[in-house]
């Protein structure tokens, strides 16, 4: 049975009262939730290091972090968001264990070496000989990326968080295929398995990008922003305004990078606000 169908069948059976969750699974879930609280609230202050989970992000973003650039102001809700994400991962694992999914490894430390540099990371789970990453997703990301039949390609179009490099680095470290992502919709509770393609083309590209980023960061290559301003469209028409690129929107250093060139303003033609390059007309 396919992974997603196996998970969904267990959940349906549970709703009907036809399945149960073993006590050892319940205990492991509880321990993982405790670990999430310890990690998020008792962990040490994080300093910049080369990490498998982040090395696929835009190079300029990582350069800013390494150089100690001033990040965007933090919101208190971010701490709960991160904690919630860890607990969702624990919940998904408990459901898969109860569904008798063939889990071969969980939270396993791995490493990747290029040249004389080794970076480390922790893969989420190995199932049926494939490495998967568990992601908690917003309704928008779940609907428009993770749950689509072409979800992998959609993520590849604008992989602002380096998810693809992360997955292939983990799988390459174990000499196993990358299976894709097990995504949980934080708003609806839906689960989707977004499969990675069997072709090695994405793998070569992702690991190649990661290796280039590693070399650039180790060699202290001079900073250069990788993204230009973007022409704004409203109802498929050019407005004459410019916004920052999607990758810049998700970057924690956009104001340090763009400086006084950008302003956060309400869209004159809509209800939302966004980052503009110059005052919007």
Predicted segment positions?
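Broad hydrophobic/π-residue packing in well-ordered secondary structure
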Residues: 62-64, 101, 163, 170-172, ...
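Short, well-structured alpha-helical interface segments that form or flank functional binding sites
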Residues: 87, 91, 120, 162-169, ...
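A short acidic, glycine-rich active-site loop
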Residues: 150-164
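Metal-dependent nuclease catalytic cores that hydrolyze phosphodiester bonds in DNA/RNA
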Residues: 1-131, 136-154
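Generic beta-strand structural signal
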Residues: 121-124, 128-130, 165-168, 177-180
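Metal-dependent nuclease catalytic regions and adjoining charged, substrate-binding loops involved
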Residues: 157-159, 169, 173-281
């Amino acid at each position: 049975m396919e992974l997603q169908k196996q998970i969904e069948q267990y959940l349906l059976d549970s709703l009907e009262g036809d399945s149960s969750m073993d006590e050892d699974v319940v205990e492991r879930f509880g321990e993982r939730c405790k670990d999430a609280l310890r990690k998020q609230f008792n962990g040490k202050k994080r300093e910049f290091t080369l990490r498998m989970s982040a090395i696929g992000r835009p190079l300029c973003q990582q350069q800013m972090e390494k150089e100690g650039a001033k990040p965007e102001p933090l919101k208190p809700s971010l701490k709960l968001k991160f904690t919630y994400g860890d607990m969702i991962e624990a919940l998904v694992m408990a459901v898969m264990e109860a569904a008798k999914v063939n889990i071969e490894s969980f939270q396993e430390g791995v490493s990747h070496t290029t040249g004389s540099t080794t970076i480390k990371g922790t893969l989420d789970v190995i199932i049926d000989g494939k490495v998967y990453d568990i992601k908690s997703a917003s309704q928008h990301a779940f609907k428009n990326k993770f749950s689509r039949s072409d979800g992998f390609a959609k993520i590849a179009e604008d992989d602002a968080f380096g998810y693809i490099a992360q997955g292939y680095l983990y799988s390459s470290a174990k000499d196993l295929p990358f299976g894709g992502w097990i995504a949980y919709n934080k708003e609806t509770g839906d689960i989707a398995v977004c499969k990675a393609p069997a072709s090695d083309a994405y793998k070569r590209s992702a690991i190649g990008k990661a290796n280039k980023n590693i070399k650039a960061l180790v060699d202290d290559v001079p900073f250069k922003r990788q993204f230009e301003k973007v022409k704004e469209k409203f109802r498929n028409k050019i407005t004459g305004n410019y916004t920052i690129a999607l990758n810049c929107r998700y970057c924690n250093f956009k104001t340090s990078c763009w400086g006084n060139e950008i302003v956060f303003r309400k869209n004159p033609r809509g209800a939302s606000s966004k980052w503009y390059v110059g005052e919007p007309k």
